[in-house]
Amino acid sequence: MKKIVALLLALCMVFALCACGNSSAKSDDIHIGIVTGSVSQSEDDRRGAEAFQAMYGEDMVKLAIYPDNFTEELETTIQTIVNLSDDPAMKAIIVNQAVPGTTEAFRRIKESRPDIICIAGESHEDLPEIGSAADLVCNNDFVARGYLIIRTAHELGCDTFVHISFPRHMSYETMSRRVAIMKAACDEFGMQFVLETAPDPTSDVGVAVAQAYILEKVPEWVEKYGQNAAYFCTNDAHTEPLLKQLLEYGGYFIEADLPSPTMGYPGALGIDLTEEAGDYEKILAKVEQAIVEKGGADHFGTWAYSYGYTVSAGLAQHALNVIKGESELTDIDDISKAYQVFSPNAAWNGSNYTNAETGVKLDNVFLVYQDTYIMGDPGHFMGSTSIEVPEKYFTIK
């Protein structure tokens, strides 16, 4: 009898060790790739990818960077994304921001590796187009935000809204539709809407020249449009010089194109966030204090948690949850759950994207946004995620 019991115990131990071995193998067999821009072009996107890698390790999470001049180096951009699929253990590839070339890269990946989950964060390509190649697309809600940013500016007492961009960005459906929505919202709230053009930092002129242009023009714009004008730019590299000059000469800034307390504010304010890195509650508090000290209370806003950081890390987390069978790929609640890991106190809202031309809702394309926070003493949330956007804005194009 003792021999039988001993044999059974030995068998149990063998089965347990096998089970542990299989579990470990499953974990080791999951590789996730994240492709972002460089720190100079989109720091928050990159930092979010690094945070996810730090959480799960370099063996599991593989990072890549597409060229700064991605419009001129299209094939390099495509190949940077595709190269991740050469890894036999690769199970998901996230691209944030999904710059031109991402759709083609995903198509090439699917030809040889249809098992890889392809996810696009903040697509620069038309959403129906990239939605045809990606398994999931998540963009900021340009429809709702187009209305809500103007509504917030109106509530803060602004009488003019100045939109700064360049032809490449204005060729994107997301940005051109948002401009149309912003203009319509300005009409509704009795505000003047102005379009200003600035150099494209990814063109031959480069980042330095583009930023110098903003530094030079803002004083002229403030003189022209007055102290009650709110400003918005579509490019990350334009944000810091715009904030710097608005703090000096006056004006409002509701939130960045891709909002974050670290989007432009540290450089514009001359503050070091090294000690606060990754802790967005501390980052927001330090940025807010500096804004107040410079006399900018109630004039400058953001999202409490970085959009780019949350998208890079959150979409990777969502992919991992899906791979493990814990989430559904195209469930907005599951996507929000993954985002919450990296923005624990944020209020989010979102919905499926509807093609304005066809009226067709895309099941794998989502538009999301976070509540707007206006910095002050004290600062306050605007409650944007609980405001119902009038239906007419969803069909403006």
Where are these regions (language model features)?
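Short, low-complexity disordered leader/linker segments with a strong preference
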Residues: 1-30, 397
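Extracytoplasmic "Venus flytrap"
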Residues: 29-79, 94-100
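Periplasmic-binding protein-like
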Residues: 32-36, 87-98, 116-121, 162-164, ...
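An alpha-beta-alpha
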Residues: 49, 142-195, 319
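Flexible loop/hinge segments that line or gate small-molecule binding clefts
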Residues: 108-142
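Hydrophobic alpha-helical segments within soluble ligand-binding/sensing domains
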Residues: 136-162, 213, 283-290, 306-324
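Extracellular/periplasmic periplasmic-binding protein-like sensory domains
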Residues: 185-193, 240-324
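Hinge/cleft segment of the Venus flytrap/periplasmic-binding protein
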Residues: 284-397
